[in-house]
């Protein structure tokens, strides 16, 4: 996707603190964990959408990795927060609706990330433990550069290319066959012989640095931000002739569905792919120990600047394919591979100004305006400063970061770019601080509308209280409303929305659906006379708007731009309630209970603060109960609130945000006006062909043909839940030799019991 001429600092989650500035997960209570889980879930889900679908990432790889790691840590400590819709259980993002969908016969998974020697050692130890290998037993691992491009799957039948698809969400990708045929590195017909009748080759589409520079020099308008964006935007073109004119390359490194095995090791497979006519990375090598793996990583990192294409780490893979098969997959990553990421690139420059951007939820986000400096081959002039605590040298828990050094205009600051996206300010050189530099005074009023900007207890950011009267919030909500994962109206992008808002043609989403009445037949000249418009383009816009009068419930919920309601949460809500009407009724009914919940949480917070001041043990549960006892709630309100917070992936923080939005008179009126123009479609029913999907399994006794870990992983991959004990909720018990009390209890409860051979028939199904 083409980017602006200058990099624009758009904070990942408005005003969100960097993970390094957050308190340890072990120090979080349930309320704090819920709030942070909701924020991180939205941040990671939006980052997935921007990176995989829109080719316009707005956070760095390092920031993304750190946020996802922290999300995983929170879910590990608070298991009730984990759910099937969490970004930790997702791969990529939903496929772009402009392209035909292609189901992947074998999922295109992501890779587990590592960042240190300890991570690499732990990976090897996990592999050995899973395979039950002795410490001295040989274990070969391949090491290859991790190309920073766009993942692509190529399907060959009889040696002929019949289909090319992007990763998409890992299960369903986008059909880009016509575009892939124009790439010189992708053979239309496989070379040699001995290839399987059906062969899916997977690899990375990328652009070299030299070709990237030439492409940007040839562009007369907007230029690409980096080679990865250029490659992704070039491949995902509706017109194949555009792709053909772009200098795309392709490295093959993996495979999906095959009708017959074509290699016994990863390295042999790489050589066979090369013989079939594919480019494979010449730096791929075999390592026999952790020390050799780390040496390969260090050598490849040293070569990074001279390779001529972008890489962001080294990928390790267990070489023996029989071992790979035994190790199998987690829900989103293979157990037999690890991506060992490179550290961020850094440079020093002067901070010339601090500007405040106002996001769609009202968050005031500080942006550093820098003296231009080259970092990682890209000129950087903007960087995010996260929030006022980060500027002041404090973490979210009040602890010092950067040794307590604050950031001031005129300072020399260290800037880093990890993943070639939005830069961050990492450090300050106090020795070079100008004597006249004053501490930065974070604004307490909105710079866009003048409304008070307040910071609520437990929040890391200040937010404008102006709501829709704030032009910055209004236009950002409109930009979000027309984004690809929301209404995605063809011809109505963010730029046009800003123009129409500026000129007074639209002020809220509902106005989009009255454009034709106001500027259509009889008044068409007003629209067609706009710069760059004509009668045909105006008519096309109206037609595109008409098509979006029917909208899936999940898209509508995401499009509303309610705080914490990201794409995944919107899908969870849609599945839980099934219709717009049911959701409205539930929220209206639950409102008194939502307010009571807020009173109870405030009481719990006051109890904690009082206990801290008095040096005693806090009793927040008792404080909550006492506060709730003062509120007279109907059973219907209690049931509606309980149902909302119990919905998969929701929880109290998101539920409160949703309730507040629907209870706000001005916001609810805008929502009602919008919905009056729409037909809201219910979610499609989920389908699965697994015989054990949704069922609860228990394993007992000794399994002789696979390890317990392998069996559990396979069951979960087929959609089952594996429990540790037998109960009335158990659907199936798999009993090996030595089964004891669990088998007896299953018999008493009438639960079906099968042996390992029957289990293998299901697992290999």
UniProtKB/Swiss-Prot annotation:
It comes from the Bacteria. NAD(+) binds at residues 61-65, 110-111, 144, 167, 204, 317, 341. CDD domains: BRCT_DNA_ligase_like (cd17748), LIGANc (cd00114). The active site is at 146 (n6-amp-lysine intermediate). Its EC number is 6.5.1.2. One of its GO terms (biological process) is DNA repair. It catalyses: NAD(+) + (deoxyribonucleotide)n-3'-hydroxyl + 5'-phospho-(deoxyribonucleotide)m = (deoxyribonucleotide)n+m + AMP + beta-nicotinamide D-nucleotide. One of its GO terms (cellular component) is cytosol. Residues 1-34 are annotated as: Disordered. Zn(2+) binds at residues 446, 449, 464, 470. It is an enzyme of class 6 (ligase). Its cofactor is Mg(2+); Mn(2+). Keywords: DNA damage, DNA repair, DNA replication, Ligase, Magnesium, Manganese, Metal-binding, NAD, Zinc. One of its GO terms (molecular function) is metal ion binding. DNA ligase that catalyzes the formation of phosphodiester linkages between 5'-phosphoryl and 3'-hydroxyl groups in double-stranded DNA using NAD as a coenzyme and as the energy source for the reaction. It is essential for DNA replication and repair of damaged DNA. PANTHER family: CHROMOSOME TRANSMISSION FIDELITY FACTOR 18 (PTHR23389), DNA LIGASE (PTHR23389:SF9). NCBIfam families: dnlj, PRK07956.1. Belongs to the NAD-dependent DNA ligase family. LigA subfamily. This is DNA ligase. It comes from Paracoccus denitrificans (strain Pd 1222). The lineage of its organism: Bacteria, Pseudomonadati, Pseudomonadota, Alphaproteobacteria, Rhodobacterales. The gene is ligA.
């Amino acid at each position: 996707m083409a980017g602006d001429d200058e990099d624009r600092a758009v904070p990942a989650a408005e005003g969100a603190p960097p993970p390094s500035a957050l308190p340890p997960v072990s120090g979080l209570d349930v309320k704090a964990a819920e709030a942070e889980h909701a924020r991180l879930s939205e941040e990671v889900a939006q980052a997935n959408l921007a990176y995989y679908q829109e080719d316009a990432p707005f956070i760095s790889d390092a920031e993304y990795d750190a946020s996802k790691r922290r999300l995983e840590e929170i879910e590990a400590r608070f298991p009730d927060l984990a759910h099937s819709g969490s970004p930790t259980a997702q791969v990529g993002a939903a496929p772009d609706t402009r392209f035909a969908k292609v189901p992947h016969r074998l999922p295109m998974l992501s890779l587990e990330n590592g960042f240190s020697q300890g991570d690499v050692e732990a990976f090897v130890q996990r592999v050995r433990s899973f395979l039950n290998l002795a410490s001295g037993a040989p274990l070969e691992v391949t090491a290859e550069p991790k190309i920073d491009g766009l993942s692509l799957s190529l399907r060959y039948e009889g040696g002929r290319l019949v289909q090319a698809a992007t990763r998409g969400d890992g299960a369903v990708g986008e059909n880009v066959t016509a575009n892939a045929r124009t790439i010189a590195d992708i053979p239309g017909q496989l070379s040699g012989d001995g290839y399987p009748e059906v062969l899916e080759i997977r690899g990375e589409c990328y652009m070299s640095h030299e070709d990237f520079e030439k492409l940007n020099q040839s562009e007369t308008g907007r230029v690409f931000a980096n080679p990865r964006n250029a490659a992704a935007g070039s491949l995902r073109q509706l017109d194949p002739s555009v792709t053909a004119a772009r200098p795309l390359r392709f490295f093959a490194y993996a495979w999906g569905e095959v009708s017959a095995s074509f290699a016994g090791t990863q390295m042999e497979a790489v050589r066979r792919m090369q013989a079939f006519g594919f480019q494979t990375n010449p730096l791929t090598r075999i390592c026999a120990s952790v020390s050799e793996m780390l040496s390969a990583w260090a050598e490849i990192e040293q070569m990074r600047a001279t390779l001529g294409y972008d890489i962001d780490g080294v990928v390790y893979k267990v070489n023996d394919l029989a071992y790979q098969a035994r190790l199998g997959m987690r829900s989103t990553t293979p157990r037999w591979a690890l991506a060992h990421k490179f550290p961020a690139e850094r440079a020093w420059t002067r901070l010339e100004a601090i500007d405040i951007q106002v996001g769609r939820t009202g968050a005031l986000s500080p942006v550093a305006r820098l003296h231009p400096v080259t970092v990682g081959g890209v000129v950087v002039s903007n960087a995010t400063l996260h929030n006022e605590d980060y500027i002041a040298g404090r973490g979210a828990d009040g602890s010092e970061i950067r040794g307590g050094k604050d950031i001031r205009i005129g300072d020399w600051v260290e800037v880093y770019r990890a993943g070639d996206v939005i830069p961050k300010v990492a450090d300050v050189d106090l020795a070079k601080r100008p004597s006249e530099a004053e501490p930065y005074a974070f604004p307490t009023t909105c710079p866009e509308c003048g409304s008070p900007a307040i910071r609520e207890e437990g929040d890391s950011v200040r937010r404008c209280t102006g709501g829709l009267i704030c032009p910055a919030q209004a236009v950002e909500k409109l930009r979000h409303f027309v984004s690809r994962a929301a209404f995605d109206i063809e011809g109505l992008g963010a730029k046009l929305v800003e123009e129409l808002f500026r000129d007074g043609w639209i002020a809220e989403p509902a106005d989009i659906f009255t454009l034709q009445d106001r500027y259509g037949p009889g008044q068409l000249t007003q629209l067609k006379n706009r710069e760059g418009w004509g009668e045909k383009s105006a008519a096309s816009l109206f037609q595109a708007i008409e098509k979006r009068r029917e909208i899936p419930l999940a898209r509508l919920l995401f499009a509303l731009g309610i705080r914490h309601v990201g794409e995944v949460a919107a899908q969870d809500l849609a599945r839980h309630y099934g219709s717009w009407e049911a959701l409205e009724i539930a929220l209206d009914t639950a409102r008194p209970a939502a307010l009571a919940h807020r009173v109870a949480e405030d009481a719990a917070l006051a109890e904690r603060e009082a206990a801290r001041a008095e040096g005693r043990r806090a009793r927040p549960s008792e404080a909550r109960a006492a506060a709730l006892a003062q509120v007279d709630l109907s059973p219907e309100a209690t049931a509606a609130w309980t149902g909302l917070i119990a919905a998969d992936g929701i929880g109290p923080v998101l539920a409160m945000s949703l309730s507040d939005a629907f209870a706000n008179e001005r916001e609810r009126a805008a929502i009602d006006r919008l919905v009056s123009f729409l037909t809201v479609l219910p979610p499609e029913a989920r389908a699965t062909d697994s015989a054990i999907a949704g069922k609860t399994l228990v394993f007992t006794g000794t399994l002789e043909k696979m390890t317990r870990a392998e069996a559990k992983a396979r069951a979960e991959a087929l959609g089952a839940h594996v429990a540790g004990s037998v109960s009335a909720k158990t659907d199936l018990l798999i009993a090996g030799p030595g089964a004891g009390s669990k088998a007896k209890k299953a018999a008493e409860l009438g639960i079906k019991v099968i042996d390992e051979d029957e289990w293998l028939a299901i697992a290999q199904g």
